[in-house]
Amino acid sequence: MFASPGPELFQFGPFVLRWYGLLIAAAVLIGLNLSSSLAQQRKLENGLISDLLPLLVLFSVIGARIYYVAFEWHNYAATPLKALAIWEGGIAIHGALIAGTLTLILFCRWRQQSFWDVLDVLVPSVALGQSIGRWGNFFNSEAFGIPTDLPWKLFIPEQNRPIIYVNQEFFHPTFLYESLWNLALFIILILLFRWGSKHLNKLPAGAMSCIYLMGYSLGRVWIEGLRIDSLCIGALPPACEGGLRIAQLMSGVMALAGSLGLWWLYGRKKPLPDPGFRPN
């Protein structure tokens, strides 16, 4: 059994340093250094990642917020300006992935880079960043699962529990499941990258990205089924009974896209269509 020490690392006057913000900043810095190193190994343009990352982070956060608010509009319709209060919580990773992808496409067209070449050096950092960032959910006592009595159960303070579970104290630490899953995915992607650097003809452009899509999505489908705060269509959390969990739907689409991409690369032995710029 374990429990969060609280969302704040320390406070100095009006300044409050929150664990979540610190973890996100750490993930961005680690991702910048790792992706820059991988880009250098793949001989991409110098400074490409450092130019790209601020745009990716900015628009991914905006996309994550818009996505969340769109599916939770019933909570914002009366006070639309609350949609801007991102510090109060409420972002969704699939919104970040959609916005990040669109940003990357436009960036690659601007800088005349192959979309898949750039994405392949980013996805290990994305997986690692997700693994790190999920610990922010731990400190905030959020994004947890259904009640459980397993040895690794997570204590949730009463004020953070849904009403129907107010008498339950211990829940599945779904943040931990996803953090470990993404860490394992990161290790697999790094090993594949190193192997692919020695066997370029066996790991074509886009293969790493497709493996990330499949790997992350399969884990998310399983973990999302345990969560009690899912965005839903046709029902309301925490149960989502009779409704559809949006994250599971999106993850299913992403897993299908990744598998089709691998089939295209290895089954048809053709390069993936590049939405960015493919040099001659």
Swiss-Prot record:
Keywords: Cell inner membrane, Cell membrane, Membrane, Transferase, Transmembrane, Transmembrane helix. The keyword Glycoprotein does not apply. Its main location: membrane. The chain crosses the membrane at residues 12-32, 52-72, 86-106, 115-133, 173-193, 203-223, 246-266. Pathway: Protein modification; lipoprotein biosynthesis (diacylglyceryl transfer). Catalyzes the transfer of the diacylglyceryl group from phosphatidylglycerol to the sulfhydryl group of the N-terminal cysteine of a prolipoprotein, the first step in the formation of mature lipoproteins. Belongs to the Lgt family. This is Phosphatidylglycerol--prolipoprotein diacylglyceryl transferase. The gene is lgt.
